Amino acid sequence: MLDCIVIGAGQAGLAVGYYLRKKGLDFVILDAESGPGAAWRHTWPSLTLFSNSASSNLPGWPMPHHEGFPPASHVIDYFARYEQRYELPIRRPVKVDKVDHDGACFHVFAGTEQLTARTVVAATGTWSAPFIPYY
């Protein structure tokens, strides 16, 4: 049984993974995407962060400098390097179908696979069904 299963490898999931790793806990991060970058993999080309790189850090390691507001490609690269730097145990692509709790532990179902853990963190974000405006 794992200490924790984190569902989602975006900003929140990576930050949780950092602290779980720091505490030496046994965990896995399940991510539905085929690679790093979370929702940034699906944005329109002109989308940027609304803050500069110095204000967009994940715990433990600052985002590399970028003049102005970083574009999606910069964020995706940062996420990928962050995952590698902290050797986060991310499995992709894994789509979680269901999470149950039996009173003692959580059961996470993904396709034909079932994992168990003492805790689950839902870090799926809000971009599972993004609204992209039409102009």
Residue ranges and their predicted role:
Residues 1-2, 85-135:
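FAD-binding core/adjacent interface of flavoenzyme oxidoreductases
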Residues 12, 35, 127:
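Conserved Rossmann-like nucleotide-cofactor binding loop
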Residues 2-29:
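N-terminal Rossmann-like FAD-binding beta1-loop-alpha1 element of flavoenzymes
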Residues 59, 63-65, 73-75, 82-87, ...:
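Dinucleotide-binding Rossmann-like beta1-alpha1 core, especially the glycine-rich loop
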